[in-house]
């Protein structure tokens, strides 16, 4: 049984925070299919401390959502500590994850995200600051990171041990380097090596979990204690039902035909509209429609119109034009979401690699907005 601080998590599955995706409606939809730990969108510590209303609005959980899980991004140990203190003292969440895995150039270029673990003292200071504020309130802190900056600057083993010594409740590893972004294949062997190095807290594996069988294979291959699912559930919230069945040893659910997929997509739209209002809610659905319909014979015109859908009524009309008896297509399986190609190099501040022991705070890497 995966244990995150005081919270048992079964099945041992965590929904990775994804900007613009893992809001309260999407988490509710996923939870209708299966249990697990569902993390809300990433929130920046600077914006939270500054009282940014958008950030506070993102930290909304349904009454039956427990534990309430949030991921924070920050580069300054002082600000991170202030943000964590705010969260725990105001009882805004039950679990806090720290983001050290973001590979986006606008973040790493200024010394944030997946660039931070290279600076061991800075990384340790941030983690300890969060743990020190959260522990008295019984709120577990976890970290999510990557293998390293690139193959010449591997950081995950040192970072894992540092985080463990600092008192985190678990360590999650996306088994890619920052330079890979989401391209290529995740190196699951690194998850196994991290599991051998970090012995007192759970180790979670992330990267290329696109089917329930992938999760079982990763855990068997690496010995990790649980899996983190990101892109694999985009347009496929029923993946959590498949994961629950696999971990419970039950037969896999029947893959949904297009009629069932359309019902889930409409349910998602209703939840978004209820949360955000008719206009914004339906706009938020647009990016999901391509994920839901991947592999189905829909037709370019209807697919395009769904990507610009403006109301629930129009959504119903467009769904009515589909051949809803289509079985679930094999083409819908496998990698989904952003993939791209590896960068030629990781954008970093000038001289960033010169001194891995520097604890200097890269203040320019602070993000003022409420999401990543």
Region spans (language model):
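N-terminal small/glycine-rich loop or linker at the start of catalytic domains
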Residues: 2-14, 46-67, 102-112, 130, ...
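Alpha/beta catalytic cores of nucleotide-metabolism and tRNA/nucleoside-modifying enzymes
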Residues: 1, 5, 9-13, 19, ...
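Alpha/beta enzyme core
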Residues: 81-112, 116-202
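Active-site beta-loop-alpha junctions enriched in small/polar residues
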Residues: 18-20, 43-45, 73-75, 101-103, ...
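Hydrophobic faces of well-ordered beta-strands that scaffold small-molecule active sites
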Residues: 13-17, 38-40, 68-72, 94-96, ...
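Active-site mouth loops of central-metabolism enzymes
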Residues: 11-21, 67-80, 116-117, 143-156
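Glycine-rich, positively charged N-terminal anion/phosphate-binding segment
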Residues: 1-3, 18-94
């Amino acid at each position: 049984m995966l244990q995150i601080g005081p919270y048992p998590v079964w099945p041992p599955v965590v929904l990775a925070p994804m900007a613009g995706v893992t809001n309260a409606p999407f988490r509710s939809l996923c939870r209708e299919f299966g249990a697990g730990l569902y993390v809300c969108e990433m929130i920046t510590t600077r914006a939270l401390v500054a009282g940014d209303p958008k950030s506070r609005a993102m930290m909304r959980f349904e009454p039956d959502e427990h534990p309430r899980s949030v991921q924070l991004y920050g580069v300054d140990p002082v600000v991170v500590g202030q943000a964590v203190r705010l969260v725990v003292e105001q009882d805004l969440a039950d679990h806090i994850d720290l983001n050290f895995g973001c590979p986006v150039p606008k973040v790493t270029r200024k010394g944030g995200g997946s660039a931070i673990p290279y600076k061991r003292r800075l990384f340790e200071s941030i983690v300890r600051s969060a743990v020190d504020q959260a522990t008295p309130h019984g709120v577990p802190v976890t970290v999510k990171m990557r293998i390293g900056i690139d193959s010449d600057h591997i950081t995950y083993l040192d970072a894992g041990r540092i985080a463990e010594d600092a008192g985190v409740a678990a360590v999650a590893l996306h088994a890619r380097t920052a330079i890979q972004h989401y391209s290529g294949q995740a190196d699951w062997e690194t998850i196994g090596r991290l599991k051998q190095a970090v012995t007192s807290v759970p180790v979670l594996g992330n990267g290329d979990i696109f089917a329930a069988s992938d999760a079982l294979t990763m855990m068997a291959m690496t010995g990790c204690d649980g899996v983190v699912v990101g892109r694999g559930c985009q347009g496929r919230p029923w993946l959590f039902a498949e994961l629950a069945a696999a971990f419970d040893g039950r037969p896999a659910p029947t893959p949904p035909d297009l009629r069932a997929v359309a019902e889930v997509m409409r349910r998602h739209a209703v939840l978004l509209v209820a949360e955000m209002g008719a206009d914004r809610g339906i706009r938020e659905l647009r990016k999901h429609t391509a994920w839901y319909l991947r592999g189905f014979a829909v037709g370019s015109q209807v697919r395009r119109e769904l990507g610009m859908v403006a109301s629930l009524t129009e959504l119903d009309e467009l769904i009515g034009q589909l051949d809803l008896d289509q079985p679930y297509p094999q083409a819908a399986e496998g990698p989904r979401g952003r993939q791209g190609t590896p960068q030629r190099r990781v954008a970093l501040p000038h001289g960033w690699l010169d001194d891995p022991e520097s604890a200097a705070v890269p203040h320019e890497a602070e993000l003022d907005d409420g999401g990543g």
